[in-house]
């Protein structure tokens, strides 16, 4: 749907729909620019204007090295509709993971991950950046502190770094409150 600037894709391996996007020449997020997809010779081929490329699980940019946004938005977290305070979040991910081809860019040496959150589902906080740890530092902790107070909390985690990104778990430290 080029007019809506969104592309929805059904992933057979995940048995779920998901949203794909590309950055345009002005670095704005827009619809996924690959409009033709086919599976042949053991590869998933994609086409866009004047280009035939294939999807590679070990490449984390598009065919012309534009970054790929990897984003996950969680479900709403609530405490029985009562207000609560989030003191601390810890993202459990592939901290300190090495590059798949043993070549390291400056970004891969300490890749950045961005958080933003919403307490009402409509307005979002500013992005807050954290890091995933230098290569080999598997004990690195990716944390977000003092997320605020509310009744309904939604978290979004994203990165555009050219690395594998796998969220394994999220720990939330929260406290009930009688404020409001």
Over which residues does each language-model region extend?
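Beta-sheet repeat architectures centered on beta-propellers
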Residues: 1-180
């Amino acid at each position: 749907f080029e007019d809506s600037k969104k592309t929805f894709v059904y992933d057979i391996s995940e048995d779920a729909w998901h949203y794909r996007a590309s950055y345009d020449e002005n670095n704005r997020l827009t619809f996924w620019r690959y409009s033709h997809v086919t599976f042949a010779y053991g590869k998933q081929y994609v086409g866009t204007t004047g280009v035939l490329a294939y999807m590679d699980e070990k490449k984390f940019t598009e065919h012309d090295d534009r970054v790929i946004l990897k984003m996950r938005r969680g479900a709403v977290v609530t405490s029985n509709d009562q207000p609560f305070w989030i003191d601390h979040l810890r993202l459990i991910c592939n901290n300190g993971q090495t590059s798949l081809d043993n070549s390291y860019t400056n970004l891969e040496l300490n890749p950045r991950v961005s958080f933003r959150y919403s307490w009402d589902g409509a307005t979002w906080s500013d992005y807050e950046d954290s890091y995933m740890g230098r290569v080999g530092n598997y004990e690195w902790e990716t944390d977000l502190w003092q997320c605020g107070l509310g009744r309904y909390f939604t978290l979004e985690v994203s990165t555009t770094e050219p690395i594998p990104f796998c969220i394994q778990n999220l720990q939330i430290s929260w406290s009930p409150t009688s404020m409001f």
